[in-house]
From Swiss-Prot:
Biological classification of the source: Eukaryota, Fungi, Dikarya, Ascomycota, Pezizomycotina
GO MF terms, alphabetically ordered: lipid binding
Range of residues in the leader sequence: none
PROSITE patterns xrefs: SMP (PS51847)
Keyword Mitochondrion: yes
Pfam families: MMM1
Biased composition range(s): Low complexity: 241-254
Comp. bias intervals (Acidic residues): 79-96
Subcellular location(s) of the protein: Mitochondrion outer membrane; Endoplasmic reticulum membrane
Name of the encoding gene: MDM12
Identification of the protein by name: Mitochondrial distribution and morphology protein 12
Species, as recorded: Botryotinia fuckeliana (strain B05.10)
Length: 431
């Protein structure tokens, strides 16, 4: 179902101007934390404009929110609704600071897991099953023996496919609701969740099976069945930790709804002692009125971002002088899947990675027929940039490092977008 946006109302007027200024400040602050190459002195972001072209938004699904959206970021855990509302009014600024800290912690954990690869098995996500106590008894015994377990998927630490990601919770004995994308990608049960049947979710899971790559590595072919089972279990644990990114700081995981405490997980690295000082993750109790919508967003417009970069010249000595280079991002092309959840006067927003996007809504018919052009889930496809450097000689740029500067800036724009807006990173707004 397509949704029409009044783009002019959203992006103009006092509110639109203030929002554009906040985005400019945010991008500028992110560039100040980036490690610059030797030939660049500094980056300054001057203006941001939304442009006149509105994105195309299509509603794909309405379902239960992702488990990470229930994480409690208040200093004092509040279960009563009235106390929670009072806490929101008095601690808005403090919550924003804590939210920034949590996003930074998720980003650092993701970087650490990427560096360590499959050699490090992270702590599984400390999700608490609160809504579907009867789900374990309804699991099919044949699911855990699926031939798709352990399939290699490029770009995901741990080498596990999307389908094994969903089967991981079954294999480890956890509830289906503990799977971060079970809410959007479909349930494992033939009839969906017990209290919220959704045939579209089951169809999405079936579509996901048809797009799961079946390329095992040579080492997996040579392994005996017990070895393959061990490898699958290790990969499943790694995938579960990748979906959370905010590692639990305590050495024990919270007790499940059945009252059975989880096993103690020792620390493997001395560098993790700093994380042990941070408070453990806490989750709010889900309610029936909680809602999440899944959208497909397409955009090919004239959004503008103006910034300057100082290029250092090494003649007659290193870093002798800096010359400002003005870069204008004049447009970009985008195609991805967005998630918007509403939980207790809070709106949570994020985009899904390409793998999770296909798992959530399946492949579009237009994507299957298109041999070229944009492909769903690839997020930023194209960024148009123009550069200006003072005087020109015979229509050519005087400096030779302009191409390197443009490449560096575009890489940082992509990195900022993916680190801040792609799940498991998400933004929370008080509404």
């Amino acid at each position: 179902m397509s949704i029409d946006l009044n783009w002019e109302t959203l992006t103009t007027g006092p509110d639109g101007i203030a929002l554009a200024e906040r985005i400019r400040d945010f991008v500028h602050a992110k560039f100040q934390t980036v490690t610059l190459p030797r030939f660049i002195k500094g980056v300054k972001v001057h203006t941001f404009e939304f442009g006149s072209i509105a994105p195309e938004v299509e509603l794909k699904d309405i379902c239960d929110p992702l488990p990470d959206f229930y994480e409690d970021i208040d200093d004092d855990y509040v279960e009563d609704d009235e106390d929670e509302e009072n806490s929101e009014n008095s601690q808005t600024d403090e919550e924003n600071e804590v939210a920034k800290t949590l996003r930074e912690r998720r980003r650092l954990d993701r970087v650490e897991r990427t560096a360590n690869g499959s050699s490090h098995v992270s702590t599984p996500p400390a999700y608490i099953d609160t809504r579907y106590p009867g789900l374990r008894s309804m699991q099919a015994s044949g699911d855990t023996g699926s031939p798709f377990l352990g399939v290699s998927t490029p770009g995901i630490p741990g080498g596990t496919s999307n389908l094994s990601y969903f089967h991981s919770q079954l294999a480890s004995g956890l509830s289906g609701t503990q799977t971060p994308l079970a809410a959007v990608a479909g349930a494992h049960l033939p009839q969906g969740w017990p209290d919220r049947p959704s045939p579209s979710l089951h169809l999405s899971a079936l579509r996901n099976q048809s797009h799961t790559p079946l390329s095992h590595t040579a080492s997996e072919r040579s392994m005996t069945p017990p070895q393959i089972a061990d490898l699958n279990q290790q990969s499943l644990r790694e995938k579960a930790s990748v979906s959370t990114l905010a590692a639990s700081s305590s050495t024990t995981r919270p007790a499940t709804r059945d009252g059975v405490p989880e096993a103690t997980i020792p620390e493997e690295h001395a560098g993790e002692s700093e994380e042990s000082t941070s408070p453990p993750r806490r989750f709010r109790e889900p309610k029936v009125e909680d809602l999440q919508t899944v959208f497909r967003v397409r955009y090919s417009g004239n959004i503008r971002l103006s910034l300057t970069v100082d290029i250092l010249l090494d003649y007659p000595m290193p870093s002798f002088v800096g010359i400002p280079v003005k870069l204008n991002i004049t447009g970009l092309s985008f195609d991805g899947v967005a998630v918007l959840a509403y939980i207790r006067k809070r709106a949570h927003f994020c985009f899904l990675s390409p793998e999770d996007a296909y798992a959530a809504i399946g492949a579009d018919e237009k994507d299957a027929d298109a041999s070229a052009g944009m492909k769903m889930g690839a997020l930023l496809h194209e960024i148009k940039v123009e550069s200006e450097i003072g005087q020109r000689e015979n229509g050519k740029q005087v400096l030779k490092n302009v191409g390197k500067v443009e490449k560096f800036v575009l890489e940082q724009v992509r990195r900022i977008f993916e680190d801040e807006f792609v799940y498991p990173s998400f933004w929370t707004f008080l509404v």
